[in-house]
Design a protein with these regions (language model features):
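N-terminal Rossmann NAD(P)H-binding glycine-rich loop of SDR-like oxidoreductase domains
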Residues: 2-22
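NAD(P)H-binding glycine-rich loop region in Rossmannoid oxidoreductase-like domains
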Residues: 28-61
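Conserved Rossmann-fold NAD(P)-dependent oxidoreductase catalytic core, especially the SDR/UDP-sugar
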Residues: 66-103
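Flexible, glycine-rich beta-alpha linker
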Residues: 88-89, 125-149
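Active-site Tyr-X1-5-Lys
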Residues: 105-132
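Alpha-helical substrate-binding/gating segment
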Residues: 139-141, 152-176, 182
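Conserved C-terminal active-site "lid" loop/helix of NAD(P)H-dependent oxidoreductases
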Residues: 175-215
Length: 215
């Protein structure tokens, strides 16, 4: 598959480019309709860079909107947005799932991530291409969790999650998944992505379909 990854977070884009196998991958700031139309899948790295002032916040959100608009015009098949689990500000003893309401902190970077998701969800309701939101636990490091972080993802788990989302054809046009490395004090459930095959459009259902008698 031909995959375009948005530039802007060098660490994440390098991890994906160097570890996603079996695909043709390009990292680029050129998010014009003409360029996006050359790809099957677009991976947006949300607004994970630091946001320093309100003007930068506005530019980031406008950039997300423009990128999604170009995706619509280019008839791309799938868009994956890499977001962050940091937009949940619940107590440590809570176990959070994909259905929980986001509670962003009053801080520009956190707000920019949350607003990016809001725009993505609106496009998810309106346009027919497949849109997948992957909230990731940070920090992202290539080592096992030492149980000091309740929200942590090693690189292997992150890459495997993105690879699954690229390869699968989901039943629904919009889905949200959480990914973090499992630990004794994990704050976020990852059952949904662990059992992602159950959401495949290729999976035959087991409901009874009455046979219609031809007249």
């Amino acid at each position: 598959m031909n995959i375009l990854i948005t530039a802007g977070n060098e660490n994440l884009s390098n991890i994906l480019k160097n570890n996603l196998k079996g695909h043709s991958i390009k990292v680029s700031n050129d998010l014009s309709t003409k360029n996006i139309s050359n790809f099957d899948c677009l991976i947006i790295l949300s607004s994970l860079k630091k946001c320093l002032d309100p003007e930068e916040l506005n530019l980031k959100i406008q950039g997300i909107y423009n990128t999604l608009s170009s995706s619509v015009e280019s008839n791309i098949k799938k868009v994956i947005m890499i977001s962050s689990l940091e937009i949940f500000d619940y107590k440590e003893n809570y176990t959070v799932t994909e259905t929980w309401k986001t509670t962003p902190k009053i801080e520009l970077t956190n707000l920019s991530i949350n607003l990016s998701e809001v725009i993505f969800k609106e496009f998810g309701r309106t346009f027919p291409f497949q849109k997948i939101l992957l909230r990731t636990g940070f920090p992202l490091k290539n080592k096992f969790n030492d149980n000091k972080n309740s929200c942590f993802t090693n690189e292997t788990d992150f890459v495997n999650a993105v690879s699954k989302l690229i390869d699968i054809n989901l039943k629904n046009q919009f889905e949200i998944f959480h990914i973090q490395t499992k630990s004794d004090n994990a704050k976020y459930l990852t059952n949904k992505i662990d059992e992602i095959d159950n959401l495949s459009a290729d999976l035959k259902d087991h409901f009874y379909h009455p046979r219609v008698q031809e007249l």
